[in-house]
Every structure is written in C-alpha cells, then in structure tokens.
C-alpha cells in the first residue's frame, strides 16, 4: 500500500502549507504559522508525504542540542490515512535521517496526550514514556518518549 508514497523536503509555498496543515491537524493545540514552518525547515530535517498528489503526513527530525543530546523523531499521519503502513514507512525514513545526524544518539519522540493513535504507534515502535508536561497556556499534555 505504501508503494506510491512520495516524500520530499517542502520547498514551494504549497508544500510548506501542506506540511503546516498536517502539523496543525495532528497537533491542534499548538498551531504553527508559515513563518514557524520556514524556521523548522532551517533548523530541522522535515519531510512532507504524499500519496499520489494527496498530502497524507509529515515528519520532523530535530538534531541534538546542548539542552537535549537526543535526536527527536516525529511522524504525523492524517487520521484518514492511518493503519495503512504509511506511519511505519515515514518512521523508517525519519529514523534513517536521525541516524545520519548522530548515529549513536538517543532517539526520542513527542506525542500529544490527546492522540491515542500516535501514542500507540510510538509504543509499538519500542518507545517508552519518560515525561508528561503541559506548555504554558496549553491544556493538553505532551508526552516525551525514548526509544528503548
């Protein structure tokens, strides 16, 4: 089913808007502006995923920083495209990007507590919860998980 899945770094305005839409749909409590997305293109490795011409998901790979020596891998799949193998394929690509950044780094992810599909997916990939927190002004917790 994933044979026609296509991923790319968002470059055009439309691709940036597609990435933004996926993020803001999957993480509705933390909307990003297009300027936020442009910033992420510069700081992180991000991909937008299409099935044919239909946007179905996105990834973010955050490199290690002084504050966090882990590489953070985030996979987002729009609800109507879940349970079809796309998340697994996107995770495989994002994990490869993470290993390119820092082969021996700890791998972490973050999931919104109100996204049970995302939490279940992360746990099936071998991630275990390490922390729950709510950002100032937010009402839904984020869950940090580490690859065991």
Identify the meaning behind each predicted range.
Residues 48, 54-63, 70-72, 76:
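Conserved beta-strand in the GNAT
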Residues 1-34, 143:
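Short amphipathic alpha-helix that is part of the acyltransferase structural core
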Residues 2-3, 132-148:
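C-terminal "cap" of GNAT-fold acetyltransferases
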Residues 88-92, 102-103, 112-132, 138-139:
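Conserved active-site alpha-helix within GNAT-family acetyltransferase domains
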């Amino acid at each position: 089913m994933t044979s026609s899945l296509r991923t790319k770094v968002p470059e055009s305005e439309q691709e940036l808007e597609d990435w933004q839409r996926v993020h803001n749909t999957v993480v509705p409590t933390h909307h990003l502006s297009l300027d936020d997305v442009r910033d992420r293109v510069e700081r992180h490795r991000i991909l937008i995923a299409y099935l044919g011409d239909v946007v179905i998901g996105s990834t973010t790979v955050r490199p290690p920083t002084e504050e966090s020596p882990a590489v953070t891998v985030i996979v987002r799949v729009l609800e109507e495209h879940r349970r079809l193998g796309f998340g697994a394929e996107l995770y495989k690509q994002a994990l490869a990007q993470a290993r390119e950044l820092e082969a021996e780094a700890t791998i972490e992810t973050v999931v919104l507590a109100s996204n049970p599909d995302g939490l279940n997916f992360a746990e099936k990939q071998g991630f275990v919860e390490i922390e729950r927190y709510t950002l100032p002004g937010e009402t839904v917790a984020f869950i940090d998980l580490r690859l065991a």
